[in-house]
């Protein structure tokens, strides 16, 4: 099927709960904007006060804290590492540059040492030594993180998993893959596709990101709607703890109800509790029929109604439902020279179906498209069934992040909200910032309520940042959302955790960290707020 043609925002509640920090949560009633502005002012005041109490920078809670009293690397340390990892202990400043800077070029460390072990035993010996010497360590995979979690803040030793890239086993009956943590996601995808399977995870950064990093950040991605999160598909992990002990929970069983599910501690912990060295993951069969539809809607409300119709009519074959706004499309055309395949619309949708019967799937998709076109929910669209055309349509969603890098400095927010509220945040942020921002754009995963809010300016602008934060977190907390849907907290968001988690939960996280890493050498300054670290 080729190109085909056509044959309100909800208001803020008047009563809501502000939860900057649970100790200061209070129910507030607002009538109109002036009242709301007063409430926001009060909340910001208490947040700044609390940030001081936590030891954070009150002007910028996402800034780096003071360096903790870790030891510094000596020549004796380097001699040990060189003997342990001959030719794989990197100290050349030129070779260290890329590992010291995050993908967005917004966080830069000053590490003088990069270690590249090949085995779990190598990681174990490194951590045992570093723990005894009180040397801080920054685990690093593909370094594609967006919150400053994968690069050193100061002079932490970088422990790279890039050479831990072997597939140990694949069972083509159960679909269970066991591999080292440094395997690149795209390479695993190719490996599985040759065997008629696929990874349950797909990301725009798949050409660089490592499966260990995906697991340590609990990455979501484009297939979560169909296959669920990594907390469900990861069956087992091998993890090296801070003192060098190896925790082998590399199970290949779908059902194991013996005691606590310890692997869940390390999924999403961003390398602060242990270094993931191997993963076993359940992989689905490769679908025999894949279709991608790229559609246009004239309003976000129509987009939501299209999603509702889509879930009802496509059912079990629906594998992705993504969106991007017109501002995103403009950036794709401007910076990456990509072509919009349909007429201009305020909103665009990428729908993917995946099934085992091409005729059945195409019939269901045709019925769905006929319904949304007839009811005027969709104004224009195109459908692809060939691999090259499917890739071209997906690139319009996957390369938005890349296009944004050409706009100057980008403030990125990865928010989880009730689906009907996703785009309200984008619109409210535009009104809130006025002319301060160059661009405010929204895109993301409608299927799981995940908004990627991006705000650009010609260069780093502290006044703009002060206008964005904590407003974006207050807004999210008001609607009981999460300030991190899939990117993690890293360095940038660690002190904002109280917007999404009660103080009791954060305190318990600190207790777990203290138990597993009493010296705090693993990825310090990340994930947990400064009062816990």
Curated annotation (Swiss-Prot):
A GO biological process held by the record: malate metabolic process
Molecular function GO terms recorded: (R)-2-hydroxyglutarate dehydrogenase activity; FAD binding; zinc ion binding
Pfam families (UniProt xref): FAD-oxidase_C, FAD_binding_4
Binding sites annotated in the UniProt record for Zn(2+): 445, 452, 486
Main location: mitochondrion
Reaction(s) this enzyme catalyzes, per UniProt: (R)-2-hydroxyglutarate + A = 2-oxoglutarate + AH2; (R)-malate + A = oxaloacetate + AH2
Family: Belongs to the FAD-binding oxidoreductase/transferase type 4 family.
UniProt name for this protein: D-2-hydroxyglutarate dehydrogenase, mitochondrial
Lineage: Eukaryota, Metazoa, Chordata, Craniata, Vertebrata
